[in-house]
Each structure stands twice: as structure tokens, then as C-alpha cells.
Amino acid sequence: MFRVSLQATRRVAFRSARQIRFYSAHPPSGGVSHMNKPALLLAGFSTLGAIYVADGCPTLIERKPAPAEKPAEETPAAGQSQSISEPTKDADESPVSAQEEGAEPVTTPENEITYSEETHQALAATLSGDEPAAIEPVAESVNEQATEPAASGEATNEPVTGISEDTKAPSLSFDDSKTAKGVVLEDEADKKEIQQTSPDAVKTASKDGSEGESDVVLHEKSPAEAETITEAEEQAEIRSISGGTAEQSATAAAAAAGVQGEKKNEQQTAYNPETGEINWDCPCLGGMAYGPCGEEFKSAFSCFVYSEADPKGINCVEKFSTMQNCFRKYPDYYAEQIKDEEEASAEASKIEDKSTTPVSTATSTVEVQTENAVFEPVLEKYVEENPQLKDTPEAAAVTNTDDEKK
């Protein structure tokens, strides 16, 4: 700064000297004295001003003072709230804290409640359940000396925070909680466990633990006596019954009725001879009672079941033919039944060509052969599983046929 001022002073002095010399050598048209006075005054003031600045004197234009550094904020001691003046609080845009509104100070590492060894031992004894003891916390701060617990019963003015005197030990220990959880798990396992009942009825346990009779009664047949009928065999049996005529259907039903007489060999059927009712929801029917031809199927099946004619079901031929005609109207739905009927008819036709019966009885022969081809597997199954039926007239035909084949 001093060097710049010195250079400016020299320039002004040289310029003033030039002007004085110029005006002295070339005076204007007026008087010389009149023109030299302003030049001399200008040169003189310029020189004085340069010298004034060069000497480090204060300038006429004052500079703005540099901003002073803010003093570091003092952190209040533990247990003391920071006092904020009203102007500073108004100027501060930050929200007012809860402590400024009068709330109790939050426990921090600097302002936390500590306990003496005696108090700690009393607390441990209380939690273990040996003896109840009142806990008197002692607050220790930076600026205040630690006070001893009032053993003599003296009251203190400072508010006591932390654990109250009503603190109690937990009701269950770690081992007790494990035991309680084990009891709950065992109870749930007992509820979900499937209970076994007598062979008269099969009962299952629901998720709620309540027992109820199942809709479908399971087979109660021991594996040593006979094999259980699978669902596929039952479906094939019903399709065979629906595709055949009344005579062989009566034979199959009679064999089934004989099997039902034995409790140990009891099979799953839609008809219950004890109650005389037909369970149309039985899985053995394959849902045919609710198809497009459900009414025709119910009519033919119930007629066969309740038939008292000899042979059984001979009076239901028309209803079975009506059911078969209905099947042909819905080939997509009853494709398997129609296929079984056609195969049975084809086999019966081959047998008829080889036979020597008169032409007058050809029609009846074809019907009988068709029925035999459809219901023969069903009757064989019942006869094999129930040897006591071999002496019945309905099963005699099947036995003779097997002997002839052998």
C-alpha cells in the first residue's frame, strides 16, 4: 500500500511540474499572472494530497469494519438449562425445544442417574425376590457434589427420577417362560393330533380341536382279509353299471348287498341298506347324479336299488335305456360311458356270430352278452373278495364262465 501511494505521489508531482513549465513558457492571451495562479494552486494542492496519503494518514473515505468473529457458545453445565434472551429467541428460526417449554430434562450420559454400591445391592436383591427394598437414586452432576442416600429419613428438595419404589421383580424367570411356552406348544399339538376311534365310525379332529364325523366312511377292512377297492375301480364299476342293462346290474347289486352283510368286509357304496337311503354325494358315483343326465341316472339307479323283481332290476330296462340315450346326446361329457358301451356291444356281436342260437332269439342273446361283457369284471371282483357268494345263483354264472375259459 505504501509503494502504490508513493508512485501516485510522484506522478502527480511530475504532472504538476509539467503544467507549471508549460504555462510559464506559453502564456495565454490574457495576463500572465491571471493564468499562473490557478495552475500553481492546482499543483500545490495535488502535491500536498499525495504527501498526505504517502505518510500513512487516514483517508477521507472510511472503510467498512471487518465482521467480528462470534464468540464460542458456552455449553451449560449438567442440570442447568441454557438461558436464551428474548431478542435472540425471536431472531432464531429453529423450533423451541421441549426443555425450553418447561419439560423435564432428558437423561443424557452427562446427566444420568447413578447408584451407590449399597443401592445397587438392594436393587439386585429386589429383582431376585429375596427381600423388597426401597431404591433411592442419587443424582450426580458435574457442578454439584454427589449426595449420599438419605438413610436417616431426611427429605431432599431435589426431584427424584428413574426407578420408583413400586418396582417389582418379574413374575416369570427365564426358565418359567420356557416352561410356559412348552405348555402352549404341547396343548396345540394335542388339539391338532388325530384321534383314533372305534371301528364303528371313523372320526377326525379339526384344526380347532373339535371332533366331527367325516362325510365319507373309510374302509374298515384289514389287509389280511382282502384288498381295498381303489377309487379307479369304483369309477369303473359305476360306468359299467350305467352302460349295461338291468339283468346284470341286478346281479351286481345282489352281490354287493351280500357283501354289506359282513362288517369286516363292508365296502363303500352309495346305498345304505340299514337306512334305505341313497347317498348321491358318494364319490363312488363319480358325480353322475349331477351331470346333464343326472335325473335319468337317479331314476335308473334308484329303480335298480329298490327293485324287488326276479331277477332284480328287470323292470328297470326302460329307464336304463332312457339313461343311455341321454348319454348319447352329450358325447363330450359321457365319452367314457359311451366308449364302454360300444366296446361291450362289439364283443357281444362277435360272440353272437359264433353262436348257434336261432334267429328269433338273436336280439335277446345280444343283450345278454352285452350285459355279461360289461358286468362280468365287477362280479368277478366281488366273488373273489367274498368266497361265500360262490354258492348264490347270481355268482354261479360268473364261476362257470371262468371255468370254461380255463
From Swiss-Prot:
Membrane topology designation? Single-pass type II membrane protein
Name the source's superkingdom.
Eukaryota
Q: Which GO terms describe its biological process?
A: protein import into mitochondrial intermembrane space
List cellular component terms (GO).
Answer: mitochondrial inner membrane; mitochondrial intermembrane space
User: The motif Cx9C motif 1: which residues?
Assistant: 293-303
Instruction: List all disulphide bridges recorded for this chain.
Output: C282-C284, C293-C326, C303-C316
Q: Which parts of the sequence form the motif Cx9C motif 2? A: 316-326
InterPro entries xrefs: CHCHD4, GCK_dom
- The answer to whether UniProt assigns keyword Transmembrane to this entry is yes
Keyword annotations:
Disulfide bond, Membrane, Mitochondrion, Mitochondrion inner membrane, Oxidoreductase, Protein transport, Redox-active center, Signal-anchor, Transit peptide, Translocation, Transmembrane, Transmembrane helix, Transport
Obligatory cofactor(s): Cu(2+); Zn(2+)
Task: Write down the SMART domains for this protein, in alphabetical order.
Answer: GCK
| Listed Low complexity bias regions | 242-260, 356-365
What's noted on cofactor binding?
A: Cu(2+) or Zn(2+).
Mitochondrial matrix-side positions: 24-37
Which portions of the chain have biased composition (kind: Basic and acidic residues)?
205-224, 384-393
Which residue ranges traverse the bilayer?
Answer: 38-54
The CHCH domain is annotated at 290-334
Q: What is known of its domains?
A: The CHCH domain contains a conserved twin Cys-X(9)-Cys motif which is required for import and stability of MIA40 in mitochondria.
> What is the documented function of this protein?
Required for the import and folding of small cysteine-containing proteins (small Tim) in the mitochondrial intermembrane space (IMS). Forms a redox cycle with ERV1 that involves a disulfide relay system. Precursor proteins to be imported into the IMS are translocated in their reduced form into the mitochondria. The oxidized form of MIA40 forms a transient intermolecular disulfide bridge with the reduced precursor protein, resulting in oxidation of the precursor protein that now contains an intramolecular disulfide bond and is able to undergo folding in the IMS.
Descriptive protein name: Mitochondrial intermembrane space import and assembly protein 40
